[in-house]
């Protein structure tokens, strides 16, 4: 997909690809896990990192967190960011 920085993993690319264009989904970690083949725990851990780095947002509606791409995340998926942009995130 894209060139990753040191803190990123293949799981991150799977999450970002699933949530990104053309679908622009907002999903819970369990739904992301079912669609990517990674464990729910792994997805939850990586979503936390991606939220902290500004690539995902977390919506805690009714106590069930949903994740979706931020504008920064959309730019990453579109290939508009450099590795330097991500290293500073």
From Swiss-Prot:
Quick check: keyword Transcription regulation in the entry?
Answer: yes
Tell me which UniProt keywords the record has, alphabetically: DNA-binding, Repressor, Transcription, Transcription regulation
Q: Which SUPFAM superfamilies match?
A: Winged helix' DNA-binding domain
Q: Please explain the role this protein plays, according to its UniProt record.
A: Transcriptional repressor expressed under lysogenic conditions, which specifically binds the host DNA site 'RRGAAG'. The binding occurs cooperatively, probably as 2 copies of a dimer. Possibly prevents RNA polymerase access to the promoters for lytic cell cycle transcription.
Q: What is this protein called?
A: Repressor protein
Question: By which gene is this protein encoded?
Answer: T6
Q: Does the keyword tRNA processing apply?
A: no
Q: Give induction info.
A: Expressed in the lysogenic host.
MF-aspect GO terms: DNA binding; DNA-binding transcription repressor activity
Please list the residue ranges the record marks as binding DNA.
Answer: 29-52
